[in-house]
């Protein structure tokens, strides 16, 4: 089985604008519904989850100029295994990240082996 990293993405303004239009009670209900659905997704796909990952915090960028703050749209990640890239992607169809919560999408990429230096 191949390993894939799925990155949950969300831009601060897009989905959040609609989320913020909800009343406090509606947001609480949606939050509970989303957490329940996410838990059900984790349970359903338990055998394919290699590492559950989690939410991601603020980003720092390091380059030749040093260290600086960086804004990105990465919200969280999970590592799954599947027989193909497409099979891995299918795990995230209608995922609660964007079907209930205000997330934009989930990007799935294969975790490739580290190239080995020829002897």
Task: Annotate each PLM feature.
Residues 1-119:
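Conserved, structured core segments of small domains
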């Amino acid at each position: 089985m191949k390993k894939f990293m799925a990155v949950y993405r969300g831009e601060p303004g897009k989905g959040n604008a609609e989320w913020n239009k909800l009343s406090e009670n509606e947001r609480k209900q949606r939050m509970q519904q989303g957490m329940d659905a996410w838990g059900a997704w984790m349970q359903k796909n338990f055998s394919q989850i290699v590492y559950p990952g989690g939410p991601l915090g603020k980003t720092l960028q390091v380059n030749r100029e040093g260290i600086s703050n960086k804004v990105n749209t990465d919200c969280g990640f999970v590592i799954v295994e599947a027989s193909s890239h497409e099979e891995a992607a299918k795990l995230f169809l209608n995922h609660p990240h964007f079907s209930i919560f205000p997330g934009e999408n989930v990007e799935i990429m294969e975790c490739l082996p580290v190239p080995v230096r020829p002897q």
